Amino acid sequence: MAPSCYKDLMPKIVDPQQRRRAVADAVHAVVARCGLEAATLRNVADEAGLAVGSVRHYFTDHDELMIFAVQELGRRVGERVWAHAERLLSGSTGSREDRRRRTEELLAEFLPLDDVRRDEVVLRHTFTTAARTRPPLLTHAEAMQQTLHELVHRTLQGAQTSGGLPADLDLELESVRLRALLDGLGLQAALFPRRFTSDLLREVLHHHLDSLVAASDRGPE
């Protein structure tokens, strides 16, 4: 072991992927707080507590940094949602009401019900909108949106399998419809949080799932 008087001279071992993710954290913080235009290399470096040269060491240019930030956002949302999915949708135990409640709880992960999810919604809409005029972002924004669609689809599928939703539900159609609902609610809540409260968002989601069960119970017209 090196003598204590030499410890400060020993080089630090930095995990490149961990550092890249820390820089992505800084991008997310700047964009959520001040908008995409504020996410310059200088501002991101300041947010991360790094020199601009250090950021450039891990990202060749601004486009690569933004692309990684989009990819990292999609990865984090997916990991967080599926950390809950196994617990909420595993097996078919419990009453139909219990399984339905677990489904609703999982889908609420896509709504801005706390600061973390609120920032995710803001970031998702910001990056997706920016991709319309920034070609380097487009493919990656589309991939993020596809990942989120698959998460919703798998959530409904798991709920259907466990008996929380009707067996005859058109999963693809209802996944698109539910994604549109969740996206719309998320955007409205991000823009007008005093009007679109957490209680209101939960109530709308609850009513939507009620409508799926009710439509199935009525049967074909």
Locate predicted features:
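Short, basic, alpha-helical segments at the C-terminal edge of helix-turn-helix-like DNA-binding modules
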Residues: Q71-V77, A85
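Solvent-exposed, amphipathic alpha-helical segments
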Residues: A22, A26-C34, R80-R87, L123, ...
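Helix-turn-helix
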Residues: A22, A26-F68, E72
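Hydrophobic alpha-helical connector segments
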Residues: V81-V121, L171-L178
